A protein has these predicted regions:
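S-adenosylmethionine-dependent methyltransferases
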Residues: 1-239
Length: 239
């Protein structure tokens, strides 16, 4: 994906496979525009019909969901972290909601990253639609790739991610990535629904980092369309 692609070019690529439109998202009186997939049911039916889903955790388009954890993370960053003039990296950004929400927190530079090409396309479109391209860069970042990433050679002040700890096989590579790229004194924050909380990751992280955990309530839309209260764990890993 070229960083120079225009919004129209990105939308042309996206609409070759998805029926999408921008939907308003009101956050504290600030209206954001976020791409919404209107034919997700048909897209999933196609994946199932072609036997493309071997492992639901890996093959389903989880990147397309606006995860409530992104809103919880933004609240935590705003209230508990020093963000002015700091650098920020979002891992597993999906459609980029967290980075877009956190764009108002005074970061000097932000990177929204994922390993899924479709996620990067949607994030780039959302960034351009909200005129944040001078603040947020969209990059393919694979934490499982060995060695240091030269793009983050100066280190990152804050690394954040919502709902990426569900794969146990990712825990060790993720901690290795933090060791290489988190600045001294930097913090990584992971938000997870309590139903998917991973104590094993915190135990591993505590061998090398200072680890703390807190809990914040959030609201999701249940299967019946009604709001449902949930509790989220916020795990902070400090170098």
């Amino acid at each position: 994906m070229s960083q120079e692609e225009t919004l129209d070019q990105l939308l042309e690529r996206i609409r070759s496979r998805f029926r999408v439109d921008f939907k308003p998202l009101d956050i504290d009186g600030r209206e954001l525009q976020v791409l919404d997939v209107e034919n997700m049911t048909q897209y999933l039916d196609k994946l199932i019909g072609t036997n493309a889903i071997k492992n639901p955790l890996l093959d389903l388009p989880l990147w397309a969901k606006v995860w409530p954890g992104s809103f919880i993370l933004e609240i935590f960053l705003r209230k508990k972290c020093e963000t002015k003039g700091k650098t920020f990296l979002e891992l597993g950004c999906g459609c980029g909601i967290l980075s877009i929400l956190a764009s108002r927190l005074g970061f000097s530079h932000m990177t929204a990253s994922d390993i899924e090409e479709d996620a990067l396309l949607f994030t780039k479109a959302n960034v351009l639609k909200n005129n944040l391209q001078n603040l947020i860069s969209v990059q393919h970042v694979d934490v499982a790739r060995p060695g240091a990433d030269p793009r983050f050679s100066d280190g990152v002040d804050i690394i954040a991610a919502s709902e990426i700890l569900y794969l146990d096989s990712l825990h060790r590579p993720l901690l290795n990535f933090l060791s290489r790229h988190l600045k001294k004194g930097g913090r990584a924050v992971f938000c997870t629904d309590m139903a998917r909380r991973k104590p094993h990751f915190a135990k591993l992280a505590s061998k090398e980092f200072k680890v703390s955990e807190c809990y914040l309530p959030g609201t999701i839309t249940g299967a019946d369309g009604k709001p449902e209260r949930r509790l989220y764990a916020l795990l902070t890993v400090e170098k």
